[in-house]
C-alpha cells in the first residue's frame, strides 16, 4: 500500500508521539520535502536532532522530540499565497499572533512565513506548527 501524502502522515505521527511523550520516533518513508520541513522545525527549536538512516529503500528519519510541539499538520490543499496574504492564513491556522510557524515552499526553497515576508516573496503553504 502506498501513502497518499507522506508529509501529512509524518506530521500527524509526530504530533501523536509528542502527545504520548516519546523522546525518539522514526519517519518512514523519508523524502527531501520531509527532511527540509524537519530542518526548519529544528532551526526554530521545535524538535531536537534528526538524522537520515539508509535502509535500502526510501530511507528513514530518526527524530528526537523535546516536548515543544503542541500541534502540527499539513495544509491541504497547498494554497498559493502572495507576499501580502500571509496574515489571512496566520489567522486560520495559528492560535495567536506571533505564535507558531507556517512553513512555505517558495522559489528560493522551504522557509517560514516570517522569512518569506521579510524577503518579499510568496509561495505555497505546506504545513503549520505551534
Curated annotation (Swiss-Prot):
Family from the record: Belongs to the universal ribosomal protein uS8 family.
Pfam families linked to this entry: Ribosomal_S8
One GO term (biological process): translation
UniProt GO cellular component terms: ribonucleoprotein complex; ribosome
Record-linked SUPFAM superfamilies: Ribosomal protein S8
Name assigned to this protein: Small ribosomal subunit protein uS8
Gene that produces this protein: rps8
PANTHER family: 40S RIBOSOMAL PROTEIN S15A
Keywords: Ribonucleoprotein, Ribosomal protein, RNA-binding, rRNA-binding
Matching HAMAP family: Ribosomal_uS8_A
Ribosomal protein keyword on record: yes
Amino acid at each position: 500500500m502506498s501513502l497518499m501524502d507522506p508529509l501529512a502522515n509524518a506530521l500527524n505521527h509526530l504530533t501523536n508521539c509528542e502527545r504520548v511523550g516519546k523522546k525518539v520516533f522514526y519517519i518512514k518513508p523519508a523524502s527531501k520535502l520531509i527532511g527540509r520541513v524537519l530542518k526548519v522545525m529544528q532551526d526554530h527549536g521545535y524538535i531536537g536532532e534528526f538524522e537520515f538512516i539508509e535502509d535500502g529503500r526510501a530511507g528513514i528519519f530518526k527524530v528526537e522530540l523535546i516536548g515543544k510541539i503542541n500541534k502540527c499538520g499539513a495544509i491541504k490543499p497547498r494554497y498559493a499565497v502572495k507576499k501580502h496574504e500571509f496574515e489571512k492564513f496566520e489567522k486560520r491556522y495559528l492560535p495567536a499572533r506571533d505564535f507558531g510557524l507556517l512553513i512555505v515552499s517558495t522559489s528560493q526553497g522551504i522557509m517560514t512565513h516570517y522569512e518569506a515576508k521579510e524577503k518579499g516573496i510568496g509561495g505555497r503553504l505546506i504545513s503549520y506548527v505551534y
